[in-house]
Structure formats: structure tokens, C-alpha cells
UniProtKB/Swiss-Prot annotation:
Chief location: nucleus
GO CC annotation, single: chromosome
Coiled-coil residue spans: none
Designated name of the protein: Histone H1.A2
UniProt function note: Histones H1 are necessary for the condensation of nucleosome chains into higher-order structures.
Length: 11
């Protein structure tokens, strides 16, 4: 799963 916020990229 890609978050719009940087550093909050979780699958």
C-alpha cells in the first residue's frame, strides 16, 4: 500500500 505521505509507505 502506498501512502501519500513520504516515509509512510506500507505494503
Amino acid at each position: 500500500r502506498l501512502s501519500k505521505k513520504p516515509g509512510k509507505v506500507k505494503e
